[in-house]
Amino acid sequence: YGCGGVQAAVENPELGLINNWLLHIRDIWFKHSSLLGEMPQERRLDTLCELNVMEQVYNLGHSTITQSAWKRGQKVTIHGWAYGIHDGLLRDLDVTATNRETLEQRYRHGISNLKLKHANHK
């Protein structure tokens, strides 16, 4: 995807206050290190971008604002898309959530798809 933020989170250079913004991506790196560690370097950053999107969909879906809206029956939909800087394409990562149940299902499905995608590229 060509995301400089994800690359900086992995390389961890001294960037001052920007490093605080990148901590969450580093947490995702460590959380999914077994999957990412098995991958060739050229696929790691793109996969970390996708994991970051999935984690952010999950976090947003668990926010009190979103949870309250869903409890009230409001039609709130969270989409997980990744934009490729290198090709200008927007990719749907298939983690769209419309309620708490679909949030959990789509998150697990998205992670499983990434593992399967990696297994098929070995």
List each language-model region with its residue ranges.
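Divalent-metal-activated hydrolytic enzyme cores
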Residues: 2-122
